[in-house]
Amino acid sequence: MADLKAFAEQLVNLTVKEVNELASILKDEYGIEPAAAAVVVSGGGDAAAAVEEKTAFDVILKSAGASKLAVVKLVKDLTGLGLKEAKDLVDGAPKPVKEGASKDEAEAIKKQLEEAGAEVEIK
């Protein structure tokens, strides 16, 4: 048990360079592809290695613009909300219209809302 604790302590104290060398050894000699998160956790602040491609996006309605009625109808259709709920969402802007959407879906929703006159943001 003490050996594992000492090993864990050594692993936690590795520098970024040492972690990269360890990753290379694991990949080349043992065929193990280390997870990016494990490398980053013990990397000690290498922010560039922590960059991940975002896969879930939120479509935020910032304002309804001039044609509020068209935006309310579109929000109703896009979200499946009732007319009153869709109106409340539009009136309460900025609010999310869709959360956790794929990039393509978020872009499509944004395009539709902007064509209806709304101001939209993707986060």
Curated annotation (Swiss-Prot):
Keyword Repeat in the entry? The reply is: no
Q: Which GO terms describe its biological process?
A: translation
Pfam families the UniProt entry points to = Ribosomal_L12, Ribosomal_L12_N
Indicate yes or no for the key word Heme: no
Name the Gene3D superfamilies on file. Answer: 3.30.1390.10, Single helix bin (1.20.5.710)
Q: Which InterPro entries does the annotation name?
A: Ribosomal_bL12, Ribosomal_bL12_C, Ribosomal_bL12_C/ClpS-like, Ribosomal_bL12_oligo, Ribosomal_bL12_oligo_N_sf
Q: Which domain of life is it from?
A: Bacteria
- What family, per the record? Belongs to the bacterial ribosomal protein bL12 family.
Function of this protein? Forms part of the ribosomal stalk which helps the ribosome interact with GTP-bound translation factors. Is thus essential for accurate translation.
State the oligomer form and interacting partners. Homodimer. Part of the ribosomal stalk of the 50S ribosomal subunit. Forms a multimeric L10(L12)X complex, where L10 forms an elongated spine to which 2 to 4 L12 dimers bind in a sequential fashion. Binds GTP-bound translation factors.
Query: What is the name listed in the Swiss-Prot or TrEMBL entry for this protein?
Result: Large ribosomal subunit protein bL12
According to its UniProt entry, this protein's organism is: Cytophaga hutchinsonii (strain ATCC 33406 / DSM 1761 / CIP 103989 / NBRC 15051 / NCIMB 9469 / D465)
